[in-house]
């Protein structure tokens, strides 16, 4: 993904503060309730671009004259304790019901990002210093002239400098880094002085390779230098803003005024090459329009014609069938499908937008257009939240590199590739659960059978990475291909290195070959002789003709998307840490719903459930959920007690017979795939279909298992033989305490029988299978508890409050809330607890005496605490 390119050239408001003030004056009670609402949107992965867009809804009282409030509004306000408990809660991967929530919000704002893959022609607007060093002085030629937002016509030629300035500032937000930013760069690193957040998105799209990449793929193993150059990511600098007021002129509209997408009325002031690029944006016809509860006005839309091309209609059919974001069905008004207007109305705030004061009748249309303002504070906040959501699933939940052996190796401090994930990518992103068409497990024993024709494209599962920096770009660190700083070689950049710096063809994919053992990446950048040159002569501020030679003769449109992702989450922010954690006797309070979920996963799940293949019970107040593994308990916390983040894919191919299911993609990224594989080894049905287009071989149990007990290293043919060996040889009797000597374990148990049960975690021996879902378990007791999740049986009843539970231990802990019994005591301070997990967490507070009041993390060093407080302050930016 090279550079962020504006989908439109919209009218800009003075600032987000102005918009916020307008909304506050229009609805004074709306913003006093608290900052809460819903974010939902799409990620469209095309062959040559990724388009991310969506809506943000703030909770606000709905006028009785326009619509009636729904009972679900109370559930949104109480999202901290039970996210959308009024029938709208759902498991990840289940049907989303955001359509029921969108009706509750009259405040709707639009966000969008457009990222191109491997388009060198889009990188020439990236660097202001580079332009000025070439004596173009763009900053002096561009003038920010306020335009009348009510005027439907503007002088297109005179407005061109300002439009060009908008493109320039929009593109400046995304800069391709000249060198890879390491996940943990050392102090004084020339790459960046901060540690950027990493957003990693899975992708199975086919990205055409250049001839240089094809030749490189046929060559020998690349050098370390090639690997380092391969690490160029998209770097987003949040301190660069587009503050220019734009005229009421929209390039996108210039190419949507025809009855089809094949013919365009080009503006004479824009060259054909750039016109082709902008016209192709009309191929993305997903408006993601929320039908607000307004009175329909047919007169407002009587002059519009609706058009749909073949490609967009296919995408919309899938969208309407599997996505509920934009559909709203009521008794009085049928569901409105996606409509693509032949021409848009003037770029004014929609009648139901937060940027316009609502009237008593809220006259409007069913397809009120949202203001398309790119790269605002809210846009960057949304992208930052995606990174923060990704960080929720770091180790121990997201051992992303180890378990499926991506070829996305991390880089060490010296820039060389490492073979593990300790210094590499440390995040597991929930977006990875959304895209299909990838193997559930690597075939490490296969051979490389690629033909010459297959090397021109890469169909393998790979990742796109986005680096999120909270500062301005450090231009002193821009280094050209010869290793010379760009800040000190202005003349050389003007004549020679400018082509290298700007016209370089960047590649941000991480390719992985499924048919051969893990190896170093084979994709490199183009050589200098293959790069397209950019003219170095002076350009007039209103003339694009001199750029025509530098643009490709034909820019391919975004075609045949196979990865349309739907995502949503809810947010809630409180100033006084009013969101209480209701985990058993947890005294913590959080300022936002995101912080609450982060606290639950990091301070409770990671500490209470250190053995993810054992049954896990949720310890939230009045919650009796029993999970099968770490995946289930994490998803339960997300849906019922957290931000309710959900992500689904609306892929036409994914719903065809023989396509790879979402469960298979889950196996690719699951930190404990063994929990899903044992059932297959014991005869459970295989998810792989005989008609599978990818011809994935069935997952097989390892031929031999090795005993790792205190250096034993004996091999066995099955998990049962290993388990019998452990019980017969290594477990003695008659001890007062038993210790597990398995590699890196060393847990102690008061009874031998408990150690025997624990050993099955290491041996993977699970002889008990559920007849309903074919899952396997290590003990009969665990199987009985699991079957109650299917039957709904709760045989254990509290004799005081008559509450029922599925397992006896949950009832035992619950009764302590009535009796006040706290049998567990801290040996350091004497504080008592009613549950062992709370005691374990409390003991850690003695080991780390410095505690952050924002995120509840503890540290043993005061300097680390101060650094964490600064980080928390940056992450707690408001949406407005």
Swiss-Prot record:
For the region Transcription activation domain 2 (AD2), give the residue spans: 611-640
Cite the record's Low complexity compositional bias ranges.
Answer: 17-26, 442-456, 545-555
Q: How is its activity regulated?
A: Active in zinc-limited cells and repressed in replete cells. Zinc controls ZAP1 DNA binding activity.
Keyword terms:
DNA-binding, Metal-binding, Nucleus, Phosphoprotein, Repeat, Transcription, Transcription regulation, Zinc, Zinc-finger
Where do the segments described as Zinc-responsive domain 1 (ZRD(AD1)) lie? 182-502
Q: Where are the zinc fingers (C2H2-type)?
A: 579-604, 616-641, 705-730, 738-762, 768-790, 796-818, 824-846
State a single Pfam family of this protein: Zap1_zf1
GO CC field: nucleus
Where does this one sit in the cell? Answer: Nucleus
According to the UniProt entry, the note on domains is: Uses 4 of its 7 zinc finger domains to contact the ZRE. 2 of these (ZF4 and ZF7) dominate the interaction by contacting the essential ACC--GGT ends, while the other 2 (ZF5 and ZF6) contact the 5 basepair central ZRE sequence. 2 zinc finger domains (ZF1 and ZF2) do not contact DNA, and a third ZF3 may be more important for interfinger protein-protein interactions. ZF1 and ZF2 bind zinc in vitro but less stably than zinc fingers involved in DNA binding.
Question: What function does the entry list?
Answer: Transcription regulator controlling zinc-responsive gene expression. Binds to zinc-responsive elements (ZREs) (consensus sequence 5'-ACCYYNAAGGT-3') in the promoter of target genes. Recruits SWI/SNF, SAGA, and Mediator complexes as coactivators in a zinc-responsive manner. Involved in zinc ion homeostasis by zinc-responsive transcriptional regulation of the zinc uptake system genes ZTR1 and ZTR2. Positively regulates ETR1 expression, affecting mitochondrial function.
Name of the protein: Zinc-responsive transcriptional regulator ZAP1
Q: Which gene encodes it?
A: ZAP1
């Amino acid at each position: 993904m090279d550079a962020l390119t504006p989908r439109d050239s919209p009218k800009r408001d003075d600032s987000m503060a102005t918009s916020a003030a307008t909304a506050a004056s229009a609805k004074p009670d709306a913003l006093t309730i608290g900052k809460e609402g819903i974010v939902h949107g799409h990620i469209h992965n095309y062959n040559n671009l990724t388009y991310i867009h969506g809506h943000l809804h703030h909770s606000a009282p709905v006028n009785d004259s326009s619509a009636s409030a729904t009972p679900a509004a109370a559930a949104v306000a109480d999202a901290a304790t039970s996210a959308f408990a009024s029938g709208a809660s759902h498991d990840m991967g289940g049907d989303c019901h955001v359509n029921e929530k969108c009706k509750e919000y009259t405040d709707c704002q639009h966000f969008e990002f457009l990222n191109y893959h491997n388009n060198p022609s889009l990188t020439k607007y990236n660097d202001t210093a580079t332009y000025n060093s070439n004596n173009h002085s763009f900053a002096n030629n561009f003038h920010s002239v306020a335009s009348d937002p009510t005027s439907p016509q503007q002088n297109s030629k005179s407005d061109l400098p300002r439009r060009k300035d908008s493109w320039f500032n929009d593109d400046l937000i995304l800069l391709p880094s000249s060198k890879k930013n390491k996940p943990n760069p050392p102090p004084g690193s020339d790459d960046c002085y901060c540690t950027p957040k990493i957003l990693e998105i899975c992708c199975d799209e086919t990205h055409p390779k250049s001839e240089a990449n094809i030749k490189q793929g046929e060559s020998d193993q690349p050098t370390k230098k090639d690997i380092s150059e391969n690490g160029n990511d998209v770097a987003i600098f949040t301190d660069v803003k587009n503050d220019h007021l734009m005229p009421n002129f929209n390039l996108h509209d210039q190419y949507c005024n025809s009855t089809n997408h094949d013919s365009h009325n080009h503006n004479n002031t824009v060259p054909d090459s750039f016109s082709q690029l902008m016209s192709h944006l009309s191929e993305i016809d997903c408006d993601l329009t929320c039908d607000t509860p307004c009175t329909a006005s047919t007169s407002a839309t009587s002059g519009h014609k609706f058009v749909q091309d073949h490609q967009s209609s296919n995408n919309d059919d899938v969208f309407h069938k599997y996505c509920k974001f934009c559909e709203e069905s009521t008794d009085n008004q049928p569901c409105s499908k996606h409509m693509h207007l032949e021409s848009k109305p003037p770029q004014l705030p929609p009648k139901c937008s937060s940027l316009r004061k609502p009237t008593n009748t809220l006259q409007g249309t069913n397809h009120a257009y949202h203001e398309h303002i790119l790269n605002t504070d809210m846009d960057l906040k949304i992208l930052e939240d995606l990174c923060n959501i990704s960080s929720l699933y770091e180790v121990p939940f997201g051992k992303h590199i180890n378990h499926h052996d991506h070829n996305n190796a991390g880089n060490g401090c010296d820039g060389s590739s490492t073979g593990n994930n300790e210094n590499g990518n440390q995040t597991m992103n929930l977006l990875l659960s959304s895209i299909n068409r990838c193997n559930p497990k690597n075939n490490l024993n296969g051979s490389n059978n690629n033909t010459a024709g297959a090397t021109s494209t890469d169909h393998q599962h790979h990742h796109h990475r986005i680096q999120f920096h909270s500062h301005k770009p450090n231009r002193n660190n821009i280094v050209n291909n010869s290793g010379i700083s760009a800040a000190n070689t202005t003349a050389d950049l003007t004549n020679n290195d400018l082509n290298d710096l700007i016209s370089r063809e960047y590649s941000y994919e991480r390719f992985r070959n499924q048919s051969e053992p893990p190896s170093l990446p084979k994709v490199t950048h183009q050589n200098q002789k293959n790069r397209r040159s950019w003219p170095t002569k002076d350009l007039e501020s209103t003339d694009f003709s001199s750029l025509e030679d530098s643009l490709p003769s034909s820019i391919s449109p975004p075609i045949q998307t196979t990865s349309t992702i739907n995502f949503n989450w809810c947010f809630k922010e409180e100033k006084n840490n009013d969101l209480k954690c209701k985990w058993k006797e947890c005294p913590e309070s959080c300022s936002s719903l995101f912080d609450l979920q982060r606290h639950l996963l990091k301070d409770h799940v990671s500490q209470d459930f250190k053995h993810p293949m054992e049954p896990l019970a949720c310890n939230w107040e009045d919650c009796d959920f029993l999970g099968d593994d770490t995946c289930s308990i994490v998803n339960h916390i997300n849906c019922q007690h957290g931000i309710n983040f959900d992500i689904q894919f609306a892929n036409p191919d994914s719903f065809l017979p023989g396509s790879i299911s979402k469960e298979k993609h889950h196996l690719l990224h699951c930190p404990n795939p063994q929990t899903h594989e044992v059932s297959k080894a014991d005869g459970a049905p295989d998810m792989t279909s005989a008609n599978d287009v990818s011809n994935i071989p069935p997952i097989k149990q390892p031929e031999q298992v090795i005993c790792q007990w205190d250096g034993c290293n004996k091999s066995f043919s099955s998990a049962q033989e290993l388990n019998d060996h452990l019980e017969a040889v290594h477990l003695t009797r008659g001890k007062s305490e038993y210790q597990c000597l398995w590699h890196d374990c060393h847990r102690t148990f008061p009874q031998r029988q408990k150690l025997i049960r624990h050993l099955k975690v290491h041996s993977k021996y699970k002889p008990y299978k559920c007849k309903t879902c074919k899952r396997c378990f290590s003990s009969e007791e665990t199987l009985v508890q699991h079957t109650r999740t299917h039957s709904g049986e709760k045989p254990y009843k509290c004799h005081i409050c008559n509450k029922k539970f599925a397992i006896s231990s949950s009832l035992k802990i619950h009764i302590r809330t009535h009796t006040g019994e706290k049998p567990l005591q801290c040996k350091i301070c004497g504080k008592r607890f009613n549950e062992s997990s709370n005691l374990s967490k409390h003991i850690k507070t003695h080991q780390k005496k410095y505690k952050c009041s924002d995120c509840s993390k503890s540290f043993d060093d005061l300097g680390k605490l101060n650094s964490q407080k600064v980080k928390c302050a940056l992450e707690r930016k408001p949406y407005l």
